[in-house]
Regions:
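Bacterial N-terminal signal peptides that target proteins for export
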Residues: 1-12
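A periodicity- and composition-biased signal for non-globular, repetitive helical segments
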Residues: 12-13, 47
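C-terminal motif of bacterial Sec signal peptides marking the signal peptidase cleavage site
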Residues: 19-23
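Bacterial signal peptide processing site
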Residues: 25-27
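Solvent-exposed, non-transmembrane regions of membrane-associated and secreted proteins
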Residues: 29-295
């Protein structure tokens, strides 16, 4: 009988030990998880860092949209329409007009009808005959009609989204297409500067001399001065090479960041890319910590 009791007590003791081990907390079991963690590290399954994710995204490519059909249909309704402008994820997606002056379309839409918000209109001095004959500085204007710089407003109020670094990073290109019979008229422009400025900075210069347009368009040196001025004022330092030999696109609107001053503008500048350029999903940029600011 005693032998049977001893065996029963021994069995009970073993059962208690098993239950005790199975009730350990996670803090009491770090060593049992360690081999699994080490195996994960060996297999390279660790989460990617933000830098690695950005580098991977920058290696991905995108395809430019085709805007020729929209332009063709719009031009059939108004011969003043010379192009179609689009920026991904913004309301900026519409016809661009050009008149014999820069005032005709201030309060007209692209169909020539009255509109407080106007439309996108190109400077009357710009040339749009073909890709090869484009002006060195193609300037397009649009209204910002909200005195609070509401970036969700109409027309070029939307450009103010580029004041947000993450948005700027995710939107490296502007698409601007002109009338033409081949793919060369469908153009992609890579942004290299986003800035606030006063009109003292002559960033909209197209010809050498305003008084004598017959002298022709600005020189490479004059364009380079505009580019440098834009980069000095830019909210970001873009990793985009641009020179006076390039053709640039200038999108300009009013800004009320500094109150209701009439001389402040918000500008997005981009350079024309080659037809076979590879397009990436992100821009490489950093904050410009010593930018020239509006005074």
């Amino acid at each position: 009988m005693k032998g049977i009791l001893k065996k029963a007590m021994a069995a009970a003791l073993v059962a208690v030990m098993v239950l005790s081990m199975s009730g350990c907390t996670e803090e009491e079991q770090p060593q049992t998880n360690q081999p699994q963690q080490e195996q994960q590290q060996d297999d390279g399954q660790q989460p990617e860092t933000q830098q690695e994710q950005e580098e991977q995204s920058q290696q991905q490519t995108v395809t430019a949209p085709s805007l020729s059909q929209q332009l063709k249909e719009a031009k059939a309704k108004n011969d003043d329409i010379i192009g179609w402008l689009k920026i991904d994820d913004l309301k900026v997606d519409g016809a661009v007009v050009q008149a014999e002056n820069n005032t005709k379309y201030e309060r007209l839409n692209e169909w020539g009808q009255y509109s407080w918000t106007g439309t996108y209109f190109a400077d009357y001095e710009c040339n749009f005959d073909s890709r090869g004959s484009l002006s060195k500085n193609t300037v397009i204007y649009g209204h910002n009609v909200d005195f609070n710089d509401n970036r969700d407003g109409e027309r070029f109020s939307q450009l103010l989204y580029f004041a947000d670094e993450e948005f700027a990073k995710q939107h490296p290109y502007v698409y601007f297409t002109i009338d033409g019979d081949d793919k060369s008229s469908e153009m992609v422009w890579e942004i290299f500067s986003v800035f606030y400025t006063t009109t003292d900075f002559d960033y909209i210069r197209i010809n050498k001399d305003y008084r004598n347009p017959q002298e022709g368009e600005i020189t490479d040196a004059q364009l380079m001065n505009i580019i440098k001025g834009a980069q000095e004022r830019s909210e970001y330092d873009y990793e985009v090479e641009v020179s006076g030999e390039d053709k640039i696109l200038t999108l300009s609107t009013c800004s009320y960041k500094y109150g209701r001053r009439k001389d402040v503008r918000f500008v997005v500048m981009a350079k024309l890319l080659d037809e076979d350029a590879v397009l990436h999903t992100q821009a490489k940029l950093t904050q410009n910590t010593d930018k020239k600011t509006v005074e």
